[in-house]
């Protein structure tokens, strides 16, 4: 029997959770294709879904609207299911400039990208888990609707090794090269292998913990062992092991040869069309580029931009949807769309933007028409591929409500008894000075403040103004990358600063119980950022705190403001009635602060290295000035010793601790 989900939690479902779990579970068992969970901020929507997954025991994909929320959900699901496979699948690009052509200035922009190795490994781990086991939860961003390698080709390319298997060393090395692994006898890293006599060490592309040692004797696999790639220490022996390809885009040799023939036929057809229209430059361009790609595919089995030939490599017909992560999800899988009011429109918009750019490339001879099939799913294709779906939002959109026939599962009462924030409207004229006084009240109580503005310029000016008045403030904007954004939110929770200013980045799903005040500047300016849905979501950021409050600065109450305030008061009234009926006293949340992906930074701003965690400054908070000085000297000696031994990560870790102790010394003595 396949492994089942085992939910770990110190809490039992409370508030509206038991009823929501029952309704969602019954709906799925009855075969309902679409259900909507209207869950207010802090009502434990993730815990509700975790219970449904555990009860039904079905592989699940959770779609989030961005990497930050996906990282938060991944962290929470890992806490709930430590014994099961919880995976993370988002775009692995830290930076991505797609191939593009600007006809007006005759400018061709080459594709340029920076790949995050850690996220690439997590993506490979996600598809491996879906292929190997049933107890899988994959937390994904909208990256899940983009083309991925064909699962059939991916499965065919695997290298299966078992003890006692008859295979010579040269055959294993040839197969590893086909899987796009490279030989590197000096630097042993992910996606490489090394050879020492009759021993082959392979560092699997999807692993960050184990490497495989294959010991051969007379063309027979004598022993398979998993070992620590850093220390070389063997951890345990295994009877069999499957080596997965280094990339999702790997293709069997026979399929590549078939694809090359089809590409040649299309090239000839395209050349005729371009010549017939007098496009000599475009004809020369497409011929040169395609012939170079064909040469590379023939010699190496792949080429730069091979995804543009995905129609032929996956054996699909023109216009057919590309293979995506949905093709790896079993037929009885479950789809959970988090913050659906944002995620669903995103899915619909991806195809159109991609298509417009590629049509220009095709028209001017940079790509052949088949490149148009290297694309994200169209919305109707997504609908056809999606299994049974639960939409989750505090403010469900029109689409979700229609799909679930207006029958919504409500989760308004929180297990903690916390009420929705009090909402107050104040005049715009004094908004900045009024905000400053409110921030100071919160800072004294060690509480945090979120401020949302309408423009980037105003956010920058406000941040500068607050800094000049001695407030500890940071500004969250769209230029900040995913990892740094996670770290800023973590630093806010840790109390590194008190105020976070942003524009449209503080709305959905950011889980910060320390935030007791949300200030919405210029709330009476109707528009996308001040719509009913946006206001409800932003107000909800203060709903995880016992003293939660939202201040809307506006000179008039717009329709959106009236609806948002009315809905917040409706929910607050329902929560109060439930609390009084059941004798519940609201309790603040005490949520632990995790390093969401284990790729963030600890407070203090420096990344942790491998090895043991160092003690924090709090460990030495009771030391006298003399003892503290002695401790700093001791740690400095330790730091220099690590550096002398070339253990730079440990040295950096101790350096951070020394810095924290020095700050403590200055503050206290």
Curated annotation (Swiss-Prot):
Residue interval(s) of motif Beta-hairpin: 92-115
InterPro entries the record matches: Helicase/UvrB_N, Helicase_ATP-bd, Helicase_C-like, P-loop_NTPase, UVR_dom, UVR_dom_sf, UvrB, UvrB_inter
SMART domains according to UniProt: DEXDc, HELICc
Family annotation (Pfam families): Helicase_C, ResIII, UVR, UvrB, UvrB_inter
Sequence ranges assigned to domain UVR in this UniProt record: 629-664
UniProt-listed PROSITE patterns: HELICASE_ATP_BIND_1, HELICASE_CTER, UVR
GO molecular function: ATP binding; ATP hydrolysis activity; DNA binding; excinuclease ABC activity
Keyword DNA damage appears in the UniProt entry: yes
GO cellular component: cytoplasm; excinuclease repair complex
A biological process term (GO) from this entry: nucleotide-excision repair
UniProt comment concerning the protein's domains: The beta-hairpin motif is involved in DNA binding.
Subunit relationships: Forms a heterotetramer with UvrA during the search for lesions. Interacts with UvrC in an incision complex.
Membership in a protein family: Belongs to the UvrB family.
Chain's role: The UvrABC repair system catalyzes the recognition and processing of DNA lesions. A damage recognition complex composed of 2 UvrA and 2 UvrB subunits scans DNA for abnormalities. Upon binding of the UvrA(2)B(2) complex to a putative damaged site, the DNA wraps around one UvrB monomer. DNA wrap is dependent on ATP binding by UvrB and probably causes local melting of the DNA helix, facilitating insertion of UvrB beta-hairpin between the DNA strands. Then UvrB probes one DNA strand for the presence of a lesion.
Designated name of the protein: UvrABC system protein B
Organism encoding this protein: Photorhabdus laumondii subsp. laumondii (strain DSM 15139 / CIP 105565 / TT01)
Gene name, Swiss-Prot/TrEMBL: uvrB
